Amino acid sequence: MFNFGNLAELMKQAQSIKENVEKAKEELKNEKIVVEVGGGMVKVVSDGLGTVLDLEIDKSLLNENEYPVLKDLLIAAINEVSERSKEVVADKISQATGLPMNMSKFGGMF
């Protein structure tokens, strides 16, 4: 026989998880991740969701001869800040859902 008490408890837990995930999203929007590459020549700042908020480039890289170096550093910085934001998201989701970090990377929540 079906136990409606268990269903009610499950629905309550689901609502709690949803609220925790929404709170985590807000916290991630306010999180700042800073990455510096090339000895600080390029700096990228993103929020915890991976949106790039700021980019600083050493003026010595802003000449035509340094373009290949600048391009490589920008790619490295953006990729690193993206990877770090994924780690921050996984941690926040793990905290919000109670799931282990490797299980909290399920698709599309953020």
Swiss-Prot record:
MF terms in GO: DNA binding
Subcellular location: Cytoplasm, Nucleoid
GO cellular component: bacterial nucleoid; cytosol
Broad class of the protein's primary localization: cytoplasm
InterPro entries: YbaB-like_sf, YbaB/EbfC
A Pfam family recorded for this sequence: YbaB_DNA_bd
Domain of life, per lineage: Bacteria
Xref: NCBIfam families: DNA_YbaB_EbfC
PANTHER family to which the protein is assigned, alphabetical: NUCLEOID-ASSOCIATED PROTEIN YBAB (PTHR33449:SF1)
Function statement: Binds to DNA and alters its conformation. May be involved in regulation of gene expression, nucleoid organization and DNA protection.
Stated family: Belongs to the YbaB/EbfC family.
The protein's assembly and partners: Homodimer.
Listed name of the protein: Nucleoid-associated protein SYO3AOP1_1366
